[in-house]
C-alpha cells in the first residue's frame, strides 16, 4: 500500500514537471543532446571502420605486388625461345659493345656503294655482276661479302665479340635475334674501311642478304644507304621455293617488294631463264 502511494506521488510529480515552464526549457536540451550523441556515435563507428578498410586495401596491394614479383621471377627462369632485338641491344651494352651511329654517312655514298642480293643460288652470277660493275667503272674495287661465312668465322674465333652469343644460340637451337647479322656485317665493313683497302672507291656486293625487311631497314640505319637490291630472277622463281621454308620465302619476297617500292630493286636474268643473254647484258649495263 505504501509502495503504491510512492509510485502515485512520483507520477503526479512527473506530470506536473512536464507541464511546467521549466520542463519546456529542459526538453529540447535533452532531445538535442540525445541527437548529438547519436551523431557522435556514428562518427566513431565510421572512424573505426576506416582503419580496417585501409588495412584491407594495403593487404590487397601487397598481395598483387607479391604475385607480380613471383611471376616475374618465374618468367626469368623460363628458357627463352628466341631473343628479341631489344634483348640483343641489352646484350651489347652488358658485354661492352657500344652501338654507334651510321657507319657510312651520305657524303661517302659515292665512295662506298652497297649492292645487296636477298637470295642467290647460282654463284656464277656473282662473277657476272662483278664484271658488269668493273665495265661501268674500272677504277672501283669490288668486294663480295658472304654473311654466312662471316658468322662461321665469328663463331670459330673465341675472342670475337659475338662468338659466345652465336655458339650459345646454336647450342640451344634458337634463331638469331633481329639485328645480329647486320651487326656482324657492320663490324666487318668497319674493319675494311679502316685499312688500306678503305682508301679505294669500293662496291660492296652482299649475297643472301637482307632476308627480312627489318634487316634491310637496319642496314640503312646502321651502316649505309643501299644503292641497288639485285633480284636474281631465275633463282627467286625456281630455287627459292625449293630450298627454303615457306616463311623465309615470304620474308625474302617482302624484301623484294620493299626495295621495289623505293625504286631500288633491279631484276637480273640469267641464261637459264626464258629471256636471252642479250637482254641480260642490257640489264647488267644499267647497274
From Swiss-Prot:
Residues spanning the membrane: 55-72
Keyword field: Membrane, Mitochondrion, Transit peptide, Transmembrane, Transmembrane helix
Cellular compartments annotated: Mitochondrion membrane
Principal subcellular localization: mitochondrion
Membrane topology: Single-pass membrane protein
GO cellular component, one term: mitochondrial membrane
Transit peptide residue numbers: 1-14
Entry's family note: Belongs to the AIM36 family.
Name of the protein: Altered inheritance of mitochondria protein 36, mitochondrial
Source species: Lodderomyces elongisporus (strain ATCC 11503 / CBS 2605 / JCM 1781 / NBRC 1676 / NRRL YB-4239) (Yeast)
Amino acid at each position: 500500500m505504501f509502495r503504491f502511494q510512492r509510485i502515485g506521488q512520483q507520477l503526479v510529480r512527473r506530470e506536473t514537471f512536464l507541464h511546467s515552464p521549466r520542463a519546456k526549457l529542459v526538453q529540447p536540451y535533452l532531445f538535442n543532446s540525445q541527437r548529438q550523441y547519436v551523431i557522435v556515435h556514428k562518427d566513431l563507428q565510421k572512424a573505426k571502420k576506416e582503419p580496417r578498410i585501409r588495412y584491407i586495401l594495403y593487404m590487397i596491394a601487397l598481395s598483387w605486388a607479391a604475385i607480380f614479383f613471383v611471376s616475374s621471377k618465374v618468367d626469368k627462369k623460363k628458357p627463352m625461345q628466341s631473343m628479341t632485338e631489344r634483348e640483343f641491344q641489352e646484350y651489347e651494352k652488358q658485354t661492352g659493345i657500344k652501338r654507334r651511329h651510321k657507319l657510312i654517312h651520305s657524303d661517302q655514298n659515292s665512295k662506298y656503294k652497297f649492292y645487296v642480293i636477298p637470295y642467290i643460288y647460282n654463284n656464277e652470277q656473282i662473277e657476272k655482276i662483278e664484271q658488269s660493275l668493273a665495265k661501268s667503272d674500272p677504277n672501283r674495287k669490288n668486294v663480295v661479302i658472304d654473311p654466312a661465312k662471316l658468322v662461321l668465322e665469328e663463331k670459330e674465333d673465341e675472342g670475337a665479340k659475338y662468338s659466345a652469343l652465336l655458339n650459345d644460340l646454336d647450342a640451344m637451337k634458337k634463331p638469331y635475334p633481329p639485328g645480329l647479322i647486320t651487326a656482324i656485317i657492320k663490324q666487318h665493313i668497319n674493319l675494311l674501311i679502316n685499312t688500306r683497302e678503305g682508301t679505294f672507291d669500293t662496291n660492296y656486293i652482299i649475297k643472301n642478304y637482307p632476308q627480312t625487311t627489318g634487316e634491310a631497314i637496319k642496314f640503312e640505319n646502321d651502316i649505309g644507304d643501299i644503292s641497288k637490291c639485285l633480284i636474281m630472277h631465275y633463282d627467286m622463281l625456281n630455287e627459292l621455293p625449293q630450298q627454303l621454308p615457306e616463311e623465309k620465302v615470304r620474308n625474302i619476297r617482302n624484301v623484294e617488294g620493299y626495295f621495289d617500292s623505293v625504286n631500288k630493286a633491279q631484276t637480273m636474268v640469267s641464261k637459264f631463264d626464258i629471256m636471252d643473254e642479250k637482254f641480260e647484258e642490257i640489264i647488267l649495263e644499267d647497274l
